[in-house]
């Protein structure tokens, strides 16, 4: 199909689903997929997600072909893909959040791709969390002693 100016519309091929859709240039990948009845979420994430705000990381897709035909990854998107809290993920360069992808030309997409846990990074995060938690608990115990001493209960 062509636009009013006679340009071809970008085609998004969904590898897993075996379907292709035409989208306007600059279209949001997540919105376009959902509008066409293509699910980008796994399991319970069909209900529990951030509705396309780029915060939860549940609409991951892998751009198999045409990764130059979409907008660049933002630092926030990279952070969400890597894993925000204790568990870190290995991020392939072509792994994206579909809600953050703007389609400029033809692409091939794999929905719900597998991803690996980054064991070393996860271990480092757990160590840091343990140290911070220990200091927080020590601070709270110290604060409790100060408060009890102040009110004369010790």
Regions found by a protein language model. Name each.
Residues 46, 68-72, 109-114:
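Short cysteine/histidine-rich zinc-coordinating motifs and their immediately flanking basic loops
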Residues 101-124:
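Juxtamembrane amphipathic/hinge helix adjacent to a transmembrane helix
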Residues 122-154:
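C-terminal single-pass membrane-anchor helix
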Residues 63, 68-89:
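Rieske [2Fe-2S] iron-sulfur-binding domain
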Residues 1-48:
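N-terminal extramembrane/targeting module of integral membrane proteins
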Residues 11, 19, 79-100:
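Polyanion-binding and phosphate-handling cores
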Residues 40-67, 89-104:
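Local cysteine-cluster metal-coordination motifs and their immediate loop/turn environment
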